[in-house]
Structures are given as C-alpha cells and as structure tokens.
Amino acid sequence: MTNSFQNSRRDLRERAFQALFNIEMGAELLAASQFAYGYDKVTREDAQVLELPIFLLSLVTGVNNHKEELDNLISTHLKKGWSLERLTLTDKTLLRLGLFEIKYFDETPDRVALNEIIEVAKKYSDETSAKFINGLLSQYVSEAPSANKS
C-alpha cells in the first residue's frame, strides 16, 4: 500500500469499518481505532502509537455514539419481513457507517459517501450484500435529500 492510499479517505473509511467491526466484537473504541489504523504501518522495531486521523476518529466515534439512531433508520428502510437482527454484522456495520457519513458529514456529498461505502462493501462482503447496501442507502438519500444533514 502506498502512503497516499493509506491516508486517503477511502482507506480511512475502510479502517473505520474495521474498527467498528472490532468494537462490535468487544474491543474498546480507541484501541480498535488504533489497531485498524496502524496494524500494517508499524514494525516491531518501530513500535509507536500513531496519531489517528481526525476523519477516522470522527467516523468511529460518531457511528458508535449514534448507533441506536442509525439502527432505527436502517430498520425503517428494511423491506417487510426483514429485521436488523437478520442482517450480518458486516452489512450492519457498513450501513451504519454509510448512513452516518451521509447524515452528519456536510463536507461529503451524499453520492460520494454512498459510492465510497459501496466500494468498501465490495471488498468485505459479497455482490448481493453490496447491492442491498446500495439500495438501502440510495433509498435513504432519495427520500429526504434536504433533511439528511443534521
């Protein structure tokens, strides 16, 4: 991985997904974020705590702090017969992350946030899940475009 990719917003979204997934498995927020950001950057001889990018911390902290609200939004956009509990942890985490950025990051256009989370979904899930995530987030964006930013 090049340094420019490691510090790109796409890479930081991917690392936020990894941290959030680890938090769901019981990890502490800061430790999960530090590991997700630094696991491939630090060698044993050069072990040091890396300064976490604000964008990464904002995503992880924001999703974690708004999880109940995000889960309610996801639930309201699920088709009849589906529940949040039926979704895989990967899909739930990706949906939370995508919804959070769409809803709370004014500097990121909704379509950019949507496309970026779909790219992460393609890497960590299958094509069916990526299409499902795309459909749910697209529905959210199209239903209330002016009300999505809080």
UniProtKB/Swiss-Prot annotation:
An annotated Gene Ontology molecular function: RNA binding
GO terms under cellular component: cytosol
Keywords: RNA-binding, Transcription, Transcription antitermination, Transcription regulation
InterPro entries attached to this UniProt entry: NusB-like_sf, NusB_fam, NusB_RsmB_TIM44
Entry-linked Gene3D superfamilies: NusB-like
Keyword Transmembrane helix found: no
GO biological process entries: DNA-templated transcription termination; transcription antitermination
Role noted for this protein: Involved in transcription antitermination. Required for transcription of ribosomal RNA (rRNA) genes. Binds specifically to the boxA antiterminator sequence of the ribosomal RNA (rrn) operons.
Family (UniProt): Belongs to the NusB family.
Entries under PANTHER family matching the protein: ANTITERMINATION NUSB DOMAIN-CONTAINING PROTEIN, N UTILIZATION SUBSTANCE PROTEIN B-RELATED
Protein known as: Transcription antitermination protein NusB
UniProt source species: Streptococcus pyogenes serotype M2 (strain MGAS10270)
Phylogenetic classification of the source organism: Bacteria, Bacillati, Bacillota, Bacilli, Lactobacillales
